[in-house]
Amino acid sequence: KRYDTCVKLKNAPIKCSWTNLGLLDDIRALKMSSNTYQFYTAFKVANTAYYYDMPFAILNNAFEIYRNTFAEFGLGVKTGIDLPNESTGLKGKNDTSGLLLDFAIGQYDNYTPLQLAQYISTIANNGSRMKLHLLKEVYSYESQLQKLIYQNKIEELNKLNTDSQYLNRVQEGLKAVMSYGGTGSGYIDKNYLPAGKTGTSQSFVDTNGDGLVDTETVSNTFAGYAPYDDPKATFTVVSPDTYNYQTTYQSYVNKRITQRISQKYFEIYG
């Protein structure tokens, strides 16, 4: 456990969580979306002992360690979906030390909604990353008889290279996110036993048409699954530019979309 204390590196602004979250373990850090818990994890990955206002120089391949791990979940790599082309996202070009902290909280490399869907499905599937498909089956109807003429086969791309006890902790953390007081509370009806994770990232848009992408906004994401004890479906919602720092209006569209699509899914499929 550790307290949710801010981090200060030499010649860099102080970095904190969205509020002071008090004493944290890994479950509560996920539930409350702690930035600083991830910062200290990044220091461990970089084999660095943190102290206030320290110079930070990465002496190992910390970025590569993160990216290789994320790739096992489907982040930064192709999902294998049955489309002629797909993006692998956007990889940050500068691996300077301070950016590792941004990377650790999802504020550096960029991923597609499909990759987020595969990532959360991998967790729901207990570490099995499955190939994505838009098409499941094709049937023909002849003389009122139904005949299967094509079927996409279930294909496992890889298994997570981690001990099941650590994946279990992540799953417990995602359940906590959706519980009372968690950042995902209310996104999916609690009766469906959801697990998931909210995300908030800084983004920029051109608001006055001058060709400069210089207005800071916030984009929201959600990835989750239900029920957590026997997952039937995963849900991924990405809502860009939902909040503009120049206004007092804040949109909860990401939450509303998640509520509606999850509710409709379980109404139809049970």
Which residues fall in each region the model found?
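A short acidic/glycine-rich loop-to-helix N-cap element
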Residues: 241-254
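Beta-lactam-recognizing serine transpeptidase/beta-lactamase-like catalytic domain environment
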Residues: 1-239
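Short, gly/Ser/Thr-rich active-site loops of penicillin-recognizing serine hydrolases
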Residues: 145-149, 154, 252-270
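Membrane-interface anchoring segments and C-terminal beta-barrel signals
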Residues: 220-224, 231-233, 243-244, 257-268
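Glycine-rich loops and low-complexity Gly/Arg-rich segments
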Residues: 54-55, 129-130, 247-250, 260-264
